[in-house]
């Protein structure tokens, strides 16, 4: 659900919602699976890469579009009318070279320096899905550790604010690096809105297919978005 298209408007809004609501919630959800959440690791916003420019969803219609095994990836590709090609990450470069695929979606960190950019240099900043991963430990093992050892392990990771800053700085640096020869395509508001409109039903589809607490989590995210917007309007509150 957290990868639903346009679930978050920007990174700062996502930061607020993760810090205020989602971290505690997912710590509890993971604990129920005998996992202890150590920290989040930001992957970054996903955008669309391709061998030729894809500026609006109509440009992606019928394109051989690589998707991962995740449900959100398949539903997004269906929504924009792409020809869906499920592939593992390690198959992307060779599939671009042979023409099996023409496009796909990924974050800058998983695109710029992995060989994908060499074969599909056009990168359109749809910024449609905010990616994160988690670093976890076996909870039974974690709970049995002395407090001092838990503190050492926790402190071995940089503060989330610092890891976010470094990740975003690296993404920007990669996109601007002339040696990578990435053709970055910023989108106008109208172009980006076209992606939003095309994928507008995906979140509800995800909620229905995922079941469980997905709808409650979505409601919590909407609450966080409203709070964040209110804080921007009334920053003194």
Predicted regions and their residues:
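Phosphate/pyrophosphate-binding betaalpha-module
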Residues: 25
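N-terminal secretory/targeting leader peptides
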Residues: 1-13, 22, 30-237
């Amino acid at each position: 659900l957290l990868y639903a298209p346009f679930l978050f408007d920007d990174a700062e809004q996502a930061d607020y919602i993760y810090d205020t609501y989602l971290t505690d919630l997912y710590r509890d959800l993971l604990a129920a699976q005998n996992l202890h959440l150590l920290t989040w690791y930001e992957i970054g916003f996903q955008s669309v890469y391709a061998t030729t420019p894809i500026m609006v969803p109509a440009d992606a219609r019928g394109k051989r579009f690589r998707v991962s095994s995740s449900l959100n990836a398949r539903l997004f590709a269906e929504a924009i009318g792409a020809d869906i090609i499920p592939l593992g990450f390690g198959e992307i470069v060779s599939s671009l070279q042979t023409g099996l695929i023409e496009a796909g979606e990924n974050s800058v960190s998983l695109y710029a320096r992995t060989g994908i950019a060499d074969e599909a240099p056009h990168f359109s900043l749809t910024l449609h899905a905010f990616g994160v991963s988690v670093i976890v430990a076996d909870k039974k093992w974690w709970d049995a550790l002395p407090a001092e050892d838990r503190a050492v392990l926790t402190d071995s990771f940089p503060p989330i604010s610092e890891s976010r800053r470094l990740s975003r700085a690296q993404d920007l640096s990669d996109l601007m690096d002339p040696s990578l020869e990435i053709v970055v395509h910023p989108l106008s508001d109208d172009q980006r809105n076209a992606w939003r409109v095309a994928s507008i039903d995906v979140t509800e589809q995800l909620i229905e297919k995922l079941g469980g607490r997905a709808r409650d989590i979505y409601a919590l995210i909407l609450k966080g978005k409203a709070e964040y917007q209110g804080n921007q309007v009334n920053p003194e509150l």
